[in-house]
């Protein structure tokens, strides 16, 4: 799993936006991204673990919810070939930014 998390980190870096593992404190209004492991998502059959998985969340705080930032992240996630979905888009009044939140399932 560590090598797959490293691939995700490299993919997010390739978007051209700053991403940090588990987040950081930024000045209000500054665009940034974070990613972190959220939970296990194991595949189970006949009462046994068939494959171990991890759900990773990717968060991007941006001024533009539908343009280049979103497209850049989604292109990189698609290129990884793992299941993912855009889970929510919200306006964060305390930062003045739009918060995009993806869930990525990583197996193996």
Kindly give the residue locations of the regions a language model identified.
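Short secondary-structure transition/capping segments
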Residues: 25-30, 58-74
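Acidic-leaning, charged glycine-interspersed low-complexity segments
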Residues: 71-108
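Short, flexible, solvent-exposed loop/turn segments with mixed acidic/basic and small polar residues
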Residues: 45-51
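Small/polar-rich, solvent-exposed N-terminal microdomains that initiate assembly or binding
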Residues: 1-44, 65
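Sterically constrained small-residue positions within well-ordered secondary structures
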Residues: 26, 49, 91-95
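Generic signal for short, ordered secondary-structure residues
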Residues: 37, 52-56, 83
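Oligomerization/assembly interface segments of phage tail-like spikes and tubes
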Residues: 52-64, 97-107
């Amino acid at each position: 799993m560590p090598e797959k998390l490293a691939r995700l980190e490299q993919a997010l870096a390739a978007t051209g936006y700053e991403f940090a593992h588990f987040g950081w404190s930024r000045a209000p209004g500054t665009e940034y991204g974070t990613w972190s492991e959220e939970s296990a998502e194991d595949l189970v059959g006949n009462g046994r673990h068939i494959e171990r998985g991890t759900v990773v969340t990717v968060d991007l705080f941006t001024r533009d919810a539908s343009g280049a930032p979103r497209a850049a992240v989604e292109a990189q996630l698609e290129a990884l070939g793992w299941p993912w979905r855009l889970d929510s888009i919200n306006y964060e009044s305390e930062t003045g930014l739009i918060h995009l939140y993806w869930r990525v399932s990583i197996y193996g």
